[in-house]
Amino acid sequence: MNVIKFPAREDWAKIVERPHLDVSELNQTVSAVLNVVRQRGDEAVKGYELKFDHVDLNDLSVTQKEMDEAEQQVSNELKEAIRLAHHNIKVFHESQRFTGKKVETQPGVTCWQKAVAIEKVGLYIPGGTAPLFSTVLMLATPARIAGCREIVLCTPPGRDGKVNPAILMAARIAGVSQIFKIGGVQAIGAMAYGTESVPKVYKIFGPGNQYVMAAKQQVSLHEVAIDMPAGPSEVCVVADDSCNAEFVAADLLSQAEHGIDSQVFLITTSNKVIDDVQEAVSRQLNLLPRKEIAQKTLENSTLVLVNDLNEAIDLSNAYAPEHLILQTENYMELAEQVVNAGSVFLGQYACESAGDYASGTNHTLPTHGYATTYSGVNLDSYQRKVTFQHLTAEGVSNIGRAVELMAEAEQLDAHKNAMTVRLNSLK
């Protein structure tokens, strides 16, 4: 773990910089796969499933029988955990329902908005070393609340042609419409373009590796919307002497086990915290089954010693982390200063894992510094706002001349005339 003490502000940009990868070759590969999927549909998807996921599929769809079998394979204890998480996610996202009100901007001029669901959405759920069934809940639950008519899910099958049963169980609980055994770039292409089996969707959500992220970016240029650009997962912990070093170490490791490209960042006002956390990390690391992955992540992690907590928050805002944990004595006060973060965890008991699974907030969050401009997934992600305006004769009288003058100044005579004929009708 790299320790930096009292860095000058002019050096912060270098400290918070994410690694940049040359993706030119990767983008060419992704583009080629997408083009074949666009042209050949199911045939191409099945071919890529055989090539990349090593499974020969006759049917891309998950059947009702497979759903029922999966439910039997998931323990009752895990089912209850999934239901609890789903309940909390549902409660939190239902609280985000839009309640538009009519506003009279001038007498006779009334404006308002209406929230309208995106009709068809696609969810990508990674498989691999950690099948993320929790992400099914995070993406499908708000889609269902928003009123999306069709919720399509793609996830890679195992070599036996089966989808992880917990993913299917979560999909059933959250109300997914259709599930397909497709992974990687071919899944993104199938949802973006549509195939004989997979319906074309209007917006694609979900995490994935560099190939999946590149595919989402490419299809978003022409075909569909996406939730957000994304990079490797990351956490920043701000801690002072009041923190529990064991808790901080556990939080850093929970992020480090995601993958070797994950980012781990600790900002503290105490030398002792740095020493205690490093010792606790070393001890806890040896207990992890994914020790090797976490170890490689930690080699690129950063521990920063700063002068005070105000400086710590300034540095965190410059970093704009996906996850921000405040383990300080005055965490509520500090929270008011946070402006750039995907999701914030307050106090020693609010571990990142709580938000990852069951507190109710969404864990699909902006990474790679995008928290400066993007929100995490929320109910608005699945809706559009349609604006309405109604003018009476009085309204035309009140704003008509202003419209004429502005249209004339922009040299848009037809725009001016559309109002002029109405004004003349009132004379």
Regions found by a protein language model. Give the residues of each.
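A glycine- and small/hydrophobic-rich beta-loop-beta segment
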Residues: 258, 266-341
